[in-house]
C-alpha cells in the first residue's frame, strides 16, 4: 500500500534533510512531517533561508503547512499539485538563494508548464554552494540527464549584507539516468577571485597562492573586482574541467583570515579530490543524488561518505521506490549506485 505520510527526524543532516524532503513531498504528493529540525545546530530550527524554502515550496504546489515560522523545529507539509509559472521570492537576509532554488527545481521540472524563478538574498554564502557552482558544475550534469534549465546571476550578494539576486528558467523535462564513474581527460583549469569593498591585494594574494601551490599559469588566474556596493565580500573559486564533468572549489574570505589561508582551504579541497581519483567531489555527489533517484537510476564515484550524503540517501529512500547502495572501491573511492525497485 502506498505510504501517504512520511515522518522524518531532522536532527541529523541539518537543512539538507528539510530541502530534500520538501522536494520529494512536492513530487510524490506525500505529506511530510519532520521534527527536530536542525536540532544539533548552534541555532536550531528554521532560519530565514529554510523558512523561505518552505514558503516557496508551498506556493509552488499550493501546500497546507503548519510550523512554518522562524525557529520552528517541527513542520507538517501537505502538498498539492505542482504549478509552473512566474515566481519571485525574497529571503530578506544573506541566506542562500541557491539552496532555495535547489529545493524548488526538481518539482518545477515536473510542472505542466515552464517556470521563471527569481530569488533574492545571498548568492555567495560560505555555508552553501555559490551560484557559480550551480552554473559550472551542477547544472551541466542536470542537462546531461535531460533537464532544461538556464540560470543567470543578476546581482552578487555576500554575507552579511545579502542583496544578491538570481533568476532561473525551467522547462518541463524528463530526467534520464546518469553514470559518472570517471572524470575523463583534463580539459583545463582556472581560478578567479571575487572581491567587493576590499583592497585589491586580497584577490591578488589569493591567486598568487594558487599559482604557487597548483602551478596554474597566470593567464588562468583572474581577479574580479566588483563595485564596493556589493561588499564587503570575497570568494576564491577554483575550476577543473574534465571530459565528463567540471568541479568547482571555493574559499570564502572572513575577518581576521589571511588571504593565503582562504586560498589554502580551496586548494586543499581540490587536491584531496584530485588525488582520490573519484569522479565527483563530496558536494556535487550530495547534490546529484536526488536527480538520479528521480531518473530511476544512476551511479557515481566520490571520495567518501559524508553526513549530507548519508542523510540524503535516508530521505530519498523514505519517499521513492529506489535503493541506494554505497560500497568502497578503494580507500579513497566510494561507489554510489541508485536502482529503481521493481
Swiss-Prot record:
Top-level taxon of the source organism: Bacteria
Name of one Pfam family that matches: RTC_insert
Catalytic site positions: 308 (tele-amp-histidine intermediate)
Root EC class: ligase
GO terms, molecular function: ATP binding; RNA-3'-phosphate cyclase activity
Ranges in a coiled coil: none
GO CC terms of this entry: cytoplasm
One GO term (biological process): RNA processing
Entry keyword Transmembrane helix: no
Subcellular location: Cytoplasm
Known function: Catalyzes the conversion of 3'-phosphate to a 2',3'-cyclic phosphodiester at the end of RNA. The mechanism of action of the enzyme occurs in 3 steps: (A) adenylation of the enzyme by ATP; (B) transfer of adenylate to an RNA-N3'P to produce RNA-N3'PP5'A; (C) and attack of the adjacent 2'-hydroxyl on the 3'-phosphorus in the diester linkage to produce the cyclic end product. The biological role of this enzyme is unknown but it is likely to function in some aspects of cellular RNA processing.
Protein name: RNA 3'-terminal phosphate cyclase
Organism (species): Pseudomonas fluorescens (strain ATCC BAA-477 / NRRL B-23932 / Pf-5)
